[in-house]
Amino acid sequence: MKVAVLGAAGGIGQALALLLKTQLPAGSKLSLYDIAPVTPGVAVDLSHIPTAVEVKGFAGEDPTPALEGADVVLISAGVARKPGMDRSDLFNINAGIVRNLVEKCAAACPKALIGIITNPVNTTVAIAAEVLKAAGVYDKNRLFGVTTLDVIRSETFIAEAKGLNVDDVKINVIGGHSGVTILPLLSQVQGVSFSDEEVAALTTRIQNAGTEVVEAKAGGGSATLSMGQAACRFGLSLVRGLQGEENVIECAYVDGGSEHADFFAQPILLGKNGVESVLAYGEVSEFEANARDAMLDTLKADIKLGVEFVK
């Protein structure tokens, strides 16, 4: 199994690469690419960790050598948020980066599963889809927006608020991956109930958690370590699905035939072809139904921005 990380010298990329080096199945290959000249050195550094995962690093303008033969590609390249920015402010820089990298994926590894981490995910996934369509290799079951950070934050914050073991908390987070488009389905969490006030406060905290980190780092970065963990969890789930493991389920932002929008985050069953099936996200509360309906104009506008960027 070969996993490529594009943007591997960045804050998310290095954290993700470290976690993959220690957690990928024995015999896997880990390929690191970044435009930054330090990238081969990151690979050398990681290669000293005693796990049966082979690491190679590639720098420069062309990621093709890193992509050849990749089964999974995780794209975290781009600029990070700074105080005062929201994820959509990143669009002007990151849109072009994602377009260029996905063009290379289309040529070098057209069958790979591609996970987009680069923000704004609501838009960059739509860009990736249009690039793959233009190249004639688009398969909606092989493209994912990685929204796992919203899930792990929800798990953490719920466990903290209710004094639970975080391993026991399971939650679906639907919609998109910025602001009001992030919707944790708190009404579905087993064995716990929330007051209306708790639901409103927790939902807002989960939606604004990225900003919480950006402000806490005081201009020194955004959520890199927790995002690295989230991306590793999702990447490992992709690998487990490819290897034939059953019942591998994650939430992700996909072109899944949703009634709500062309791309929508919801639970998916992963397998040898990427998305084996898109799962129903179940019954929602009145609060959740209203929040879902209220987000759709924002989500659709984000998607349209990505489609028009490529066209």
UniProtKB/Swiss-Prot annotation:
CDD domains: MDH_glyoxysomal_mitochondrial (cd01337)
Binding site for NAD(+): G7, A8, A9, G10, G11, I12, G13, D34, N94, I117, T118, N119, M227
UniProt xrefs under SUPFAM superfamilies: LDH C-terminal domain-like, NAD(P)-binding Rossmann-fold domains
EC number: 1.1.1.37
Uppermost EC category: oxidoreductase
Positions with a binding annotation for substrate: R81, R87, N119, R153
Active site: residue positions: H177
Keyword annotations of the record: NAD, Oxidoreductase, Tricarboxylic acid cycle
Record GO biological process: malate metabolic process; tricarboxylic acid cycle
GO cellular-component term (any): cytoplasm
Reactions catalysed according to its record: (S)-malate + NAD(+) = oxaloacetate + NADH + H(+)
Domain of life: Bacteria
GO molecular function: L-malate dehydrogenase (NAD+) activity
A Pfam family hit: Ldh_1_C
Family per record: Belongs to the LDH/MDH superfamily. MDH type 1 family.
HAMAP family listed in its UniProt record: Malate_dehydrog_1 (MF_01516)
Free-text function comment from the UniProt entry: Catalyzes the reversible oxidation of malate to oxaloacetate.
Record note on quaternary structure: Homodimer.
Protein name: Malate dehydrogenase
Naturally occurring in which organism (per UniProt): Shewanella sediminis (strain HAW-EB3)
Lineage: Bacteria, Pseudomonadati, Pseudomonadota, Gammaproteobacteria, Alteromonadales
Gene name for this UniProt entry: mdh
